[in-house]
Amino acid sequence: MWIGWIEFDLLLGDVHSLKEKRSILRPIIADLSRRTEAAAAEVDAQDLHRRTVIGVTVVAGSAAHVRGVLDRADRLLAEEHPEITVLSARQGLHSSRD
């Protein structure tokens, strides 16, 4: 079994409240989950208006499949969501045999 994760540090556009932030993030997180078939959630910086951290994780039988899903999530955020700026992305891959 392989477990992979990617964590995105994001800068949001012209956001002035947490309510505005949620209205931007909710569809992005839903899109990530739907199009990558992985779990996605806001995992840090919940109290900041213009910054957030989104995590995506996937469990699969092969490392290649996990890498493919994480790469797809990375491309999706970078190419299809102009309302955000990806400041950094960190990822990890672990085997159940580790």
Model-derived regions, located:
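Short, charge-patterned binding micro-sites
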Residues: 3, 40-62, 94
